[in-house]
UniProtKB/Swiss-Prot annotation:
Functions as a Na(+)-independent bidirectional multispecific transporter. Contributes to the renal and hepatic elimination of endogenous organic compounds from the systemic circulation into the urine and bile, respectively. Capable of transporting a wide range of purine and pyrimidine nucleobases, nucleosides and nucleotides, with cGMP, 2'deoxyguanosine and GMP being the preferred substrates. SUPFAM superfamilies: MFS general substrate transporter (SSF103473). It is found in: Basolateral cell membrane; Apical cell membrane; Cell membrane. The chain crosses the membrane at residues 21-41, 144-164, 178-198, 202-222, 228-248, 257-277, 346-366, 373-393, 402-422, 430-450, 464-484, 491-511. The gene is SLC22A7. InterPro entries: MFS_dom, MFS_sugar_transport-like, MFS_trans_sf, Orgcat_transp/SVOP. It comes from Oryctolagus cuniculus (Rabbit). This is Solute carrier family 22 member 7. Belongs to the major facilitator (TC 2.A.1) superfamily. Organic cation transporter (TC 2.A.1.19) family. It is a multi-pass membrane protein. One of its GO terms (biological process) is prostaglandin transport. It holds the Pfam family Sugar_tr.
Amino acid sequence: MGFEELLEQVGGFGPFQLRNLALLALPRILLPLHFLLPVFLAAVPAHRCALPGTPANLSFQDAWLEAYLPREADGTFSSCLRFTHPQAVPNITLGREGRSPGDLQGNRSSMPCTQGWEYDRSEFSSTIATEWDLVCEQKDLSRAASTFFFVGVLVGAVAFGYLSDRFGRRRLLLVAYVSALVLGLASAASVSYVMFAITRTLTGSALAGFTIIVMPLELEWLDVEHRIVAGVLSSTFWTGGVMLLALVGYLIRDWRWLLLAVTLPLAPGILSLWWVPESARWLLTQGRVEEAQRYLLRCARLNGRPVPQDGLSREALSEVAAGERVVRRPSYLDLFRTPRLRHISLCCMVVWFGVNFSYYGQSLAVSGLGLNVYQTQLLFGAVELPSKLLVYLSVRHAGRRLTQAGTLMGAALALGIRLLVASERSSWSTALAVMGKGFSEAAFTTAYLFTSELYPTVLRQTGMGLTALVGRLGGSLAPLAALLDGVWLSLPKLAYGGIALLAACTALLLPETRRAQLPETIQDVERKSLQEEEMAMKQVQT
């Protein structure tokens, strides 16, 4: 008897599993609050050099700025330079001594802002950019905050993946909760950018535990029939978090209090672990039969399933545990040992890199669309709901491969057409940005389903772990690609769209899995490949 048969006895989907999904909803909601937090946390408001003796009389301020600040090519005042000497502005009298800028002498040479900056605080009262003047020569540091965070997620994913297999999902989930809470509070109390960068990187590592542990902890208590439904249901919690971030960001305009607001809910999450069950499958692989028996009996009781006395006896569970332990632990090298599996793994790595790169690249670019940042964030969250409906319908009728390629192609086209729109603030540009975000979310949802069906059962978790790892690398590089706007304003969009297009073409190289039986072993994957080649040869001959 295997573990799937045990689940049939105690109920593979019922009140026990629904309660588990509800208890694990909190980390899914909190993840986007942290992953997309740089939209508000690291925002750079309009700014200009702080000037000496700026007049209080508003009617004279424009003339005063004209005397001190050079203009950019688009006619706006420079954000990073001021004139070395005030320039002449005719027929205007300013200053405490009654001088007019027309009386002031000096050439038109400029210099950096030596007295700091003044910021437009109408949208944000405080961000890390205004806190530590991360503008002009230091602007890259503001954008790099996202990269530091995602690098932490990348490292944490590797660590939590290994440790949760060794010490258990529930115990490591507690570690993730506590460490994320402590490090999040430390980030909010940062006294320097260096301290903030370090604590945010470590916070990313801690939160990676949620991404690695929560999904297996849900799926390992579900029967095969309900795993896809549960996966789609769980993904809506992420969408809820995306929209919730818009509300929280709107209500809290100071970055320290905002960081506290998204960190403190981790505390009740720690308490909720009292009711979260450990994975009985993992317990059996470790030979901890008594604990597994206790959780399985609890599952049967909550699901209202009468269990035969010998069905969950220690002897029966010991036999299952022995069967689970004799299976050789898979390694990442197994994903590349055979031709077909190597092909699938390499293609999935490209697809996941493209999906993450385009998703986070667009999700973090919420300024300059003709709406304020809060409206844009809400729109970006709301469009994810119809995106999930699109995926649900498309994978059933068009198939997984075409859906994956089509959604990535849609994201690439939306980004490409935006390059042709004259104004970023036009309604067309805004609509295309929302469409691109919707397609990238649809590609993300499809990738989870498609990838899980491509890998055989013995390597499914290993394959998902590898592709997720490469995907997080794409998420780490996405904020850095935004720095390319210093070379050409549209270059970041070209990068996001180009990578999405490459991933779309790569997805077409993957085999279709619609209505196909899931492979159990590596041999099943290779055997299917040979069958497809034989069918292709017959079609060519006929």
